Each structure stands twice: as structure tokens, then as C-alpha cells.
Regions:
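Processing junctions and N-termini across compartments
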Residues: 11, 15-18, 249, 308-312
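Flexible loop residues that form catalytic
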Residues: 29, 80, 132, 199, ...
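Radical SAM enzyme [4Fe-4S]-AdoMet core and its adjacent flexible, acidic
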Residues: 32-38, 46-50, 130-132, 136-271, ...
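Receiver (REC) domain switch/active-site residues of two-component response regulators
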Residues: 100, 125, 192
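Conserved alpha-helical substructure of the radical SAM core
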Residues: 1-122, 348, 367-370
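Flexible mid-to-C-terminal extensions adjoining Fe-S/redox cofactors in radical SAM and related proteins
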Residues: 1-6, 27, 31-36, 274-375
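Short cysteine clusters
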Residues: 17, 21-24, 255, 273, ...
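A cross-family glycoside hydrolase active-site/sugar-binding cleft signature
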Residues: 9-11, 76-78, 103-107, 128-132, ...
Length: 375
């Protein structure tokens, strides 16, 4: 019998984007041959979602099979840039009623007023928008041209004025860290709808972009001003973890994300972690997909990913907004603090996360008891 999960992170056409972020993780992944050294600098491919399109047949099946197997109340759809797909809004409309929350990650450039109006009408959409800074220097690893950056910010401002809940995903690098305080002050204008989640640049090429040791005090200084920016920030404990990551030079704290969220792709590939695409666990579009999904949560890789101390090199460099789930499981934040974020605010998600934590604690207690008896 399959376990219940919180969410499915569905990645659509991950190698197709309208921006060319220098630190893009797709080309740093070993999951697929198509990812190898592929930093998405080629022209994006044309694709379409519609009744007779191959993409529609695939992603409809991926979403349905994962939801039916793991009873997930949360669907996150990301890319690439998903709005490069003609008709993507129709897929999102198909999925919205099936979930407690539909999380849509985008760089915002192709989001239209029609999209925003339809999102509002569904009532359960959270937008996760990628923007490292409102100023060009801090966002220049994403958008090197100042004129294009200005257009990107203009589009994102429209999203922030839409009334929809927005989580800003901001990669901290040696350029953006200089502008954290200015950026947060700018975002405060939209405090009724926005949450600001800064997190470290990741991946095997992160060394080129990560904040320098002499810049860590800039993060310390930002955290010292937590109260000034509190209306748009995650819990204070999030920044305690972030500072620990920087001061210790790597992740040393436990991750629970793979026990809660799984990652799938529009070609059907399944991998256990939404943060780092470690391994191909099988394909949910195969006729025997149930056998592949039966392995979820039970393989040696899962044991390594969920170990009390991070064991894999890739995990040592990982810290993302998903970490608030781990923080709740580790009693670093309360359920109320976790669910203040719009992604986890719906009552069914709140109840499920609390139950999954209790189930895990009971299993941990049983395991400890077995170990004691064995001695």
C-alpha cells in the first residue's frame, strides 16, 4: 500500500525557458541525458497543451496517477517556464479543483491579466515568483540586460498588485545579497499578499556565484532588522537556519522534504526530492508504474536523504523554502508559523502535515524501542 504524501512537484519541460539564468540547475543535473551541460541557453521549444497534444496526455496522466496513488492535496507546477506552453492555463484550470492548493512557479514574464483573473476565480492558487532583486545588479545573473530586467520587474509588479498570494523565491548570491534590505523594503509595499523567501544559490557550480565569506555579515545585518521586515518574512527560525548554513559552510541539519513531497516530470520520470534531481525511480506513464511508485519512501536513497545528518554531498549545499517543512518536523517552528505561508494555509493541508509529523514521531519512537530491546 502506498504512503500518503503532502505534494507532487510537477516539472513541465524543464529544459525550456525564456530566461537564461547563469546558475540554472537543469544543466547541473545528472538525472537525464538531456540535462547534461544544458544551461537552457538555446531558444525555448514550442509546445502546446490541448485535447490532442502529446504533452496534455502525459501531464494529465502524471498528475492523476500521483494524486490517486498518494492522495496529495498539493500540486506544484514548475519548469522551465511553464507559460511558454500554449494552453498551460487550461491544464492549471483542470487541476485546480482537484487539490487544496495549486502552486504555480514562474518568472512572471509571460503571466497575463487573463491568467491572473482566472487564478483569482479558482480561489486556491499560490504564485511562486522567481526574482533575486528588484534592482538590476542583484538580479543580473538571471537577466543580464538592464532593459529586460526593467520589463521583468514591471510584469512582476502587476502580479503583486493582483491580490493573489505570492511567495517571492530569491536566490542569494554575491550580487543579490548586497541588496537584501533594499529589496525587502520594496516588497513591503505589497505586504498584504507577499512573502519573501531568500535562499542560497545551489548546485555543483554554486562556487562561482555564492556569497563570499566577507558578505555573510550582510545576512547577519538583515536578520538583525527582522522586525522591520517581519510582515513579509517567514518565521525568524528560518533565518536562524539560513545563518547556520552560512556560518557552518554547509547544511548540517536534517531534511524531511522527501518524506512529504515527490518530484515528477512531464515525461513521466519520478525522482524522490523536489530540490535535487537525484535518481530516476521509474516512469509513472509506464504500464507497470505501480511497481515503481511502491518504492517511494522505501529505498536506500530515501534512507540517505532522510538521515538525521545529511550524508550526500548535494544535500550539504541545499537549503530552500521547502525547509520550513523540515523545521516544523524538528520543532523549530509551530504549525501556526508553518501554515502562515499561503502554500500550507488550507485546513486540509494543515491537518495532513500535523498527522504526518505525528506518524513520523511514532515510528521514530518504535524504532528507538526496538533498538533498546536489541541491546
Amino acid at each position: 500500500m502506498a504512503i500518503q504524501l503532502l505534494g507532487n512537484d510537477l516539472v513541465v519541460n524543464e529544459d525550456s525557458c525564456n530566461l537564461s539564468c547563469e546558475y540554472c540547475l537543469t544543466g547541473q543535473s545528472n538525472l537525464k541525458q538531456s540535462h547534461h551541460q544544458q544551461l537552457i541557453f538555446q531558444p525555448p521549444k514550442v509546445d502546446r497543451y490541448g485535447d490532442d497534444s502529446p504533452l496534455a496526455q502525459r501531464i494529465d496522466a502524471v498528475s492523476d496517477r500521483m494524486r490517486e496513488t498518494f492522495d496529495v492535496p498539493l500540486l506544484k507546477v514548475t519548469g522551465g517556464e511553464i507559460f511558454l506552453v500554449k494552453g498551460m492555463i487550461d491544464f492549471l484550470e483542470r487541476e485546480a479543483p482537484k487539490y487544496s492548493v495549486l502552486v504555480v512557479q514562474t518568472n512572471g514574464v509571460l503571466v497575463t491579466e487573463e491568467h491572473l483573473e482566472r487564478f483569482r476565480s479558482w480561489g486556491n492558487v499560490v504564485l511562486q515568483v522567481s526574482l533575486d532583486s528588484h534592482l538590476h545588479h542583484g538580479n543580473s545573473y538571471r537577466v543580464p540586460q538592464p532593459s529586460l530586467h526593467a520589463k521583468v520587474v514591471q510584469r512582476i509588479e502587476r502580479i503583486l498588485r493582483s491580490g493573489l498570494p505570492v511567495e517571492i523565491y530569491a536566490v542569494l548570491n554575491d550580487r543579490s545579497v548586497v541588496e537584501m534590505e533594499d529589496y525587502a523594503a520594496w516588497l513591503l509595499r505589497f505586504a498584504d499578499v507577499v512573502s519573501y523567501f531568500p535562499f542560497p544559490v545551489r548546485g555543483p557550480h554554486a562556487e562561482q556565484y555564492k556569497i563570499r565569506p566577507d558578505q555573510i555579515p550582510l545576512v547577519d545585518a538583515f536578520v538583525d532588522r527582522y522586525d522591520d521586515f517581519a510582515p513579509i518574512l517567514p518565521p525568524r527560525a528560518y533565518f536562524a537556519r539560513l545563518l547556520r548554513f552560512y556560518h557552518e559552510g554547509k547544511r548540517t541539519f536534517r531534511c524531511h522534504v522527501p518524506r512529504l513531497v515527490i518530484s515528477t516530470f512531464s515525461d513521466g520520470v519520478v525522482t524522490p526530492c523536489p530540490n535535487i534531481w537525484f535518481s530516476d525511480m521509474g516512469n509513472v506513464l509506464d504500464d507497470d508504474y505501480e511497481a515503481s511508485l511502491e518504492k517511494v519512501g522505501k529505498t536506500g536513497l530515501y534512507q540517505a536523504l532522510l538521515d538525521p545528518k545529511p550524508r550526500l554531498a548535494a544535500c550539504h549545499g541545499c537549503f530552500t523554502p521547502w525547509d520550513t517543512l523540515s523545521m516544523y518536523f524538528e520543532d523549530e517552528i509551530t504549525l501556526d508559523e508553518l501554515c502562515a505561508a499561503p502554500t500550507y494555509a488550507p485546513e486540509p493541508i494543515r491537518k495532513l502535515v500535523a498527522r504526518l509529523k505525528e506518524d513520523w514521531k511514532l515510528e521514530e519512537a518504535r524504532a528507538a524501542s526496538r533498538d533498546t530491546l536489541a541491546v
